[in-house]
Swiss-Prot record:
The keyword Repeat does not apply. GO terms for molecular function: ABC-type D-methionine transporter activity; ATP binding; ATP hydrolysis activity. It catalyses: L-methionine(out) + ATP + H2O = L-methionine(in) + ADP + phosphate + H(+); D-methionine(out) + ATP + H2O = D-methionine(in) + ADP + phosphate + H(+). The keyword rRNA-binding does not apply. InterPro entries: AAA+_ATPase, ABC_transporter-like_ATP-bd, ABC_transporter-like_CS, ACT-like_dom_sf, MetN_ABC_transporter-like, NIL_domain, P-loop_NTPase. The complex is composed of two ATP-binding proteins (MetN), two transmembrane proteins (MetI) and a solute-binding protein (MetQ). The gene is metN. This is Methionine import ATP-binding protein MetN. Its EC number is 7.4.2.11.
């Protein structure tokens, strides 16, 4: 059974500016298991970057308790000496939107800089840097300067540098937001690969639910300093409860964009009185059921599929359909009940039930 490697309990972060008090994080509790890829999602100002900085005490909380790898590092106050905190921080790597590479140093020199106080010999450092650059796919770019690298390559150097001290945790704070979509996918694939190869726990800070959908297994949603929803990616995408979470997921799945086009179709604009426009959401075993065929077989209800999407989230198929159901009123009622009994979420978008 996995254990919690990061435990943030009842965290508050308050800033005092002149006569104003700003609460950036309010009473947030998050436990992250070892080996998780854990996404923290929210719009700008939600408090997600402030929250993640308390993990290594770059930001000290105003209240709460922080436990990292079974060591309490904060409980109302910092519980470690300066030297203990320095060593603990070596277990936590960080990458950011801006790569923060030293322009006058080569890729290998940038990575080696993180090993300055490692106690390794010159030969050991050189071997480790070579291994790290190979791990992130830059073995042939060791002697290149940042100006000779693309944005994605610069971020790979930053990742190699963050891994130099063999951390157990890697925090990614909007690390792909300055990259193009193709490069973003490559960096996310690299993070996923590192998670699997090294057993690395990855904490992703992002404002894009698509990124969470691509590689995370758990997600927390923040709004105005509060944690408003948390769970597995499968749970959250299958059944988002909060309006903000629903907005994020609609954007990530493309359903909002699809609905604009669907609503302009003649079959929808002039929906007949014996028809319903419905949205179906299903996950896991229910994706294997020939449900729409069964509706006609048992209820003589026809199904016209206008939109369909199926994705694999954390190893589980999750699907969404927009369908026009047509049939007699009693048959439509029976069909809706059968759909729900099959474990499929149904929402009537248009038509009289």
């Amino acid at each position: 059974m996995s254990r919690d490697i990061i435990k943030l309990d009842q965290i508050d972060v308050t800033f005092h500016q002149k006569k104003r008090t700003i609460t950036a994080v309010k009473d947030v509790t998050i436990h992250i298991q070892e080996g998780d890829i854990y996404g923290i999602v929210g719009y700008s100002g939600a408090g997600k970057s402030t929250l993640v900085r308390v993990i290594n005490l770059l930001q000290k909380p105003s209240a709460g308790k922080i436990t990292i790898d079974d060591d309490v590092i904060f409980d109302g106050k910092v519980t470690l000496t300066a030297e203990q905190l320095r060593r603990k921080r070596q277990d936590i790597g960080m990458i950011f939107q801006h790569f923060n590479l030293m322009s006058q140093k080569t890729a290998e020199e940038n990575v080696a800089f993180a090993l300055k106080h490692s106690g390794l010999s010159k030969e050991e450092k050189k071997a480790k840097v070579a291994k790290l650059l190979d791990l992130v796919g830059l073995a042939d770019r060791a002697e290149n300067y940042p100006s000779q690298l693309s944005g994605g390559q610069k971020q790979r150097v930053a990742i190699a540098r963050a891994l130099a001290n063999d951390p157990k945790i890697l925090i990614s704070d909007e690390s792909t937001s300055a990259l193009d979509p193709k490069t973003t996918k490559q960096i996310l694939a690299l993070l996923q690969d590192l998670n699997q190869k090294l057993g690395l726990t990855v904490v992703l800070i992002t404002h894009e639910m698509q990124i969470v959908k691509d590689i995370a297994n758990r997600v927390a949603v923040m709004q105005d300093g509060h944690l408003i929803e948390e769970g597995s990616v499968l749970e959250i995408f299958s059944n988002p409860k909060q309006p903000l979470t629903q907005d994020f997921i609609s954007t990530a799945t493309g359903i909002d964009e699809a609905m604009v086009k669907i609503e302009k179709q003649e079959i929808v604009e002039h929906l007949s009185e014996n028809s319903l426009l419905v949205q179906l959401k299903y996950a896991g075993a229910s994706t294997d059921e020939p449900l729409l065929n069964e509706l006609y077989k048992h209820y003589q209800v026809m199904a016209n599929i206008l939109y369909g999407n199926i994705e694999i989230l954390d190893g589980t198929p999750v699907g969404e359909l927009v369908v026009v159901l047509s049939g007699e009123k009693a048959a439509l009622a029976g069909a809706q009940e059968a759909i729900r009994q099959a474990g499929v979420q149904l929402k009537v978008l248009k038509g009289v039930q």
